[in-house]
Swiss-Prot record:
Cofactor note: Binds 1 zinc ion per subunit.
NCBIfam families reported in the protein's UniProt record: PRK08061.1 (NF005974)
PANTHER family tied to this protein: 30S RIBOSOMAL PROTEIN S14, SMALL RIBOSOMAL SUBUNIT PROTEIN US14M
General function of this protein: Binds 16S rRNA, required for the assembly of 30S particles and may also be responsible for determining the conformation of the 16S rRNA at the A site.
UniProt protein name: Small ribosomal subunit protein uS14
Organism encoding this protein: Borrelia duttonii (strain Ly)
Assigned GO CC terms: cytoplasm; small ribosomal subunit
One of the GO BP terms on file: translation
Cofactor(s), names only, from the UniProt record: Zn(2+)
Amino acid sequence: MAKKSMIVKALRKPKYKTRQKNRCKLCGRPKGYMRDFSMCRICFRNHASAGLIPGVSKSSW
């Protein structure tokens, strides 16, 4: 889990646009971020497996 201070810091508008770091809306994880869903890969996998994200299904071939 991300530190609470880092999550709050990421929510503030940065002075320069290049300093912005995307974070997961659910857990605050900065890495493995998926822009389309605004969450990290771990939270995405959990929500997709539970069927909480409409239109997403497990692929198999």
